[in-house]
Amino acid sequence: MDMSATPDRFAVVIDDESIILAGMEIMLDTWGYQVLAAEDVETVLAKLPGCPLPNVILSDYRLRDGWSGITAVRAVREACGVTVPAIILTGDTGAELMAAAKADQIRILHKPVQPNDLRRQIDSLIAVG
């Protein structure tokens, strides 16, 4: 990823399904975002130094190596030193997930998510963030 120019909009995307990750990256790119996309949290954390401050973090909930979307968002926020607006995309509807997301100020979107709905959610998070 070329970070030579600071983008107006920068997103971090984490999803361990490569096809979904690629689709999210292409979609965000068409919306004018520069994207740091990775299948695991460790890769994001390794590439994050030197990147612009993200406008938004998008993560799947169930990730590999024992990570969840909640812990991934926490790790990226800690690395950035600020509470970056975040959305977790999931099929899960459990009360534990909802409570953790609320406590960490993370928005939950249930799959399947339509692109226009995702864009509206991102725009509204950035507007208040």
List where the protein language model places each region.
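Residue-level recognition of oxygen-bearing side chains
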Residues: 19, 43, 68
